[in-house]
Amino acid sequence: MAQPLGSVSAGPGGWTHAQPAEAGFAPDLEARLDKAVADKRVWNLHGLVVARHGRLVLERYWEGQDFAWGRDIGRVAFKADTIHDLRSVTKSIVGLLYGIALAEGKVPPPEAPLFQSFPDYADLGADPARARLTLHHVLSMSMGTDWDETTVPYTNPANSEIAMEFSPDRYRYILERKVVMEPGKHWTYSGGATALLGRIIAAGTGTPLHAYARRVLFDPLGLGPTEWTVGRDSVPSAASGLRMAPRDLARIGHMLASGGAFQGARIVPATWLERCFTPVVSCDERRRFGYQWYLGDFVFGQPPRARLERWWGAFGNGGQRLFVLPTFEIVVAITAGNYDTPDQWVPPIRVMREVVLASLQ
């Protein structure tokens, strides 16, 4: 069904290290992690990187069964340079790429009508309901179209993303979905929305998505090798195809915690990050959604002095996570192997609450 596109950086970016106490954590940070693993509070973790103020505080890798976009690749002993499926964390990175391309004048602004970017599908855009759609709706997954990736598992061809991948024309499949809710009012998780963004970026820049990402984001950050899995149509999957080492994912988080800059160079416009991290719609009672990024709050401290601290997040199937806590300049990258399981969300949240936040002083 899919093949990877290899892409190698001009040179890996190094990390400086800090002891937990030097970075404002309790000295037993690693011991807390070991206890969580031993007590089976967390399971099937493959990699964990915790960084603060641009320094690596905790890095740990395990051995486990892994898959590359559903293809069983066997049992893997993970290391610092082992690339891993990011699954839908890819979506959030594509959201950053859109902002970079916008600053270059290569893609339309969020307020632009969606179908202006898809003239080959003017027959679909003639529908009055679809004609109301803008790129703002696409970026915030609030298109209001008939799309289901949440109640139908990815192992079922009726899942909308899987159906898209098997469609002879992925973009027609996405764009012909009926508008069933008012755009901009409701969040519907949609890999199709991100696929549209990937197409607009590639068309506007004249560069395949994976090559554009390497030029404007991965190489400027000094990231190591990556792969970007492509679909049956040889198009890189903007929704879920990126494979990257956790260290490199954490470096993207560090850049975000630094306001979009890295080593004095502007990578992502600060104005775009403000839009990414401004809530547009609610996902559920606890999470909001901006432009391809999840937004929420963690409880920090103990009553009566407990307070809420915001986080920005990128989430992927199996327990892949990138958390950025901007107030503390903390970045946490997690890879795991709990693909397609109903409790896959549990280990990452326990790592955050019982290890990282519980150790913060």
Q: Where do the PLM segments sit?
A:
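N-terminal leader/targeting segments and the immediately adjacent pre-domain N-terminus
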Residues: 1-73, 102-108, 140, 163, ...
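Short, charged, amphipathic alpha-helices and their helix-cap/turn boundaries
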Residues: 32, 60, 69-74, 113-116, ...
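Short Gly/Pro-enriched turn/cap motifs at secondary-structure boundaries
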Residues: 38-40, 127-128, 162-163, 185-186, ...
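Active-site SXXK
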Residues: 54, 82-110, 138, 197-201, ...
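Active-site helix/loop module of the DD-peptidase/beta-lactamase fold
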Residues: 80, 85, 104-145, 176-178, ...
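Active-site-proximal alpha-helical segments within enzyme catalytic domains
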Residues: 193-200, 240-261, 320-336
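Active-site Gly/Thr loop motif
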Residues: 224-226, 277-331
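Structured C-terminal helix/loop/strand segments within mature extracytoplasmic catalytic/sensor domains
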Residues: 314-361
